[in-house]
Structure formats: structure tokens, C-alpha cells
């Protein structure tokens, strides 16, 4: 089995004359939590959409689950889980109906549906509201439902685009506890976020700004390299320093 779940080289995406992602290169090891950090508008969502086969890159190369992101996008979409920052839920459907919908999208055999629905309702703790309209659920509950729908086909590679945006700190903590449980079961997680404190949950991170990678590695290594004499420094300090260098 190939040790890398994701690998990209000089990946670029242009929209007209605007370069959203500027020749980025990185790899993601199987079974790790990989953080893609940066401010809003840095190129995080564009990158994750290229990796998930949603948009076609302008140039470069890349593989996800050993499939080519240029020529095998459909195969990629079938083997990964993807949770967008807007949660991609049908608000006029119930949680039960949303789960059924995604079972069909991912071509899960019908004889497995009942077990999968039960499994998703258990891991999301949504049994008690499975017949309520999704639009009536609190944001944190919709977040859990969106994650459950992304996992309904039990993928080994999960992409999460700003998954904790708009939810309270307690919900964020519970969310990360669950993500760690997934990786303990062998799932690889690629997560984008603009919350620098969430890097503490990641095995490795890439920091991106204006479409370009400004640092990558273990969060502690990045901080120590930039602040060898400041043990109190954190990743927010590191990012500010990296931005000042660019200026």
C-alpha cells in the first residue's frame, strides 16, 4: 500500500488572470490528521476542491488515494468523504432522509442501508431528532449530520473544509475528539481551517497565504524554528511573523 494518501506537485489554479493557488507541493501520509491553515481567501477551499475532483487544476500534478486528480476525478469522489464549509445538507429533508440521500450518492448497496443509517445516527447522536427537518436543528447538530453523511460509505480518506466555522467552542472540542477517534481507526483526515489553535490537533500542517505555502511541518517544529528563544510563542505568532516576512 502506498504510504501517501495525497501527493501534489506544483499544483496551480487560475481564474482568468487571478492565481488562487500558486504551485503548491505537499503530501499527506495515511492515517494522519493533516491541517491546511490560512486566513480566509488564502486558497484553502480551492485546493481542497481540486483534490476532491470538484474543480480541475490549471497545471501541476497530483494523486488522491492513488487516483490522478486530472483524469480520475470520478473515482476520487467515490472513495473519499467530503464535508464542505456550507455542510451540503438538504434543509427541507430530515436527518434520516439526508443520510439515505448520501447512501445513494455513494452507491452503497441497498442491503447495507439500514445498518449504515443506524451507524450514522449512533456516531452523530442524532437518533432523537432523525425525523425533524434539518433546517430546524442547531448549527452544531447540522455539523454532526454533515460529518455523518460524509462518512456514510465509510471512506478511509476524509476531507473537511472549515468544518468548525460558525459553531461554539464546546462543539469544536467534541468535533475534534471524534476526528481523533476516526484516525485511530485508520482514517486519514485533511482539514482546512483559519483557526490557528486547531493546529494542535494535527500531526502536520501546511500554512498558506495568497495561494502560496509559507511553511509546512509539525506545528511545534514551525514555532521552534521561528522562535527558538520564545517558548511561549504559538502558531498565531508564527503566522504573523511569516506574513511580515512576505511584506
Each language-model region and where it sits:
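Conserved ABC ATPase "signature" region
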Residues: 100, 104, 111-129
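Conserved ABC ATPase signature
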Residues: 92, 133-140
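Catalytic Walker B motif of ABC-type/P-loop ATPase nucleotide-binding domains
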Residues: 158-161
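ABC ATPase "signature
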Residues: 216-217
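Conserved ABC transporter NBD signature motif
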Residues: 60-68, 75-76
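Conserved catalytic motifs of ABC-family nucleotide-binding domains
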Residues: 154
Amino acid at each position: 500500500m502506498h504510504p501517501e494518501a495525497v501527493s501534489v506537485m506544483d499544483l496551480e489554479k487560475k481564474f482568468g488572470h487571478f492565481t488562487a493557488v500558486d504551485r503548491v507541493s505537499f503530501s499527506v501520509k495515511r492515517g494522519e490528521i493533516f491541517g491546511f491553515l490560512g486566513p480566509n481567501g488564502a486558497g484553502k477551499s480551492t485546493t481542497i476542491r481540486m483534490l476532491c475532483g470538484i474543480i480541475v487544476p490549471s497545471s501541476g500534478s497530483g494523486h488522491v488515494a492513488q487516483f490522478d486528480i486530472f483524469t480520475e476525478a470520478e473515482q476520487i469522489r467515490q472513495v473519499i468523504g467530503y464535508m464542505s464549509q456550507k455542510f451540503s445538507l438538504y434543509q427541507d429533508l430530515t436527518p434520516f432522509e439526508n443520510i439515505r440521500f448520501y447512501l445513494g450518492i455513494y452507491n452503497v448497496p441497498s442491503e447495507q442501508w439500514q445498518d449504515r443509517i443506524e451507524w450514522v445516527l449512533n456516531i452523530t447522536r442524532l437518533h432523537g431528532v432523525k425525523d425533524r427537518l434539518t433546517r430546524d436543528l442547531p448549527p452544531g447538530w447540522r455539523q454532526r449530520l454533515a460529518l455523518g453523511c460524509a462518512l456514510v460509505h465509510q471512506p478511509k480518506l476524509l476531507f473537511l473544509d472549515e468544518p468548525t466555522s460558525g459553531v461554539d467552542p464546546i462543539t469544536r472540542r467534541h468535533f475534534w475528539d471524534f476526528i481523533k477517534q476516526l484516525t485511530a481507526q485508520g482514517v486519514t483526515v485533511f482539514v482546512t481551517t483559519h483557526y490557528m489553535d486547531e493546529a494542535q490537533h494535527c500531526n502536520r500542517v501546511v500554512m498558506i497565504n495568497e495561494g502560496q505555502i509559507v511553511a509546512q511541518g509539525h506545528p511545534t517544529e514551525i514555532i521552534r524554528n521561528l522562535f527558538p528563544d520564545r517558548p511561549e510563542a504559538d502558531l498565531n505568532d508564527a503566522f504573523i511573523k511569516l506574513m511580515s516576512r512576505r511584506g
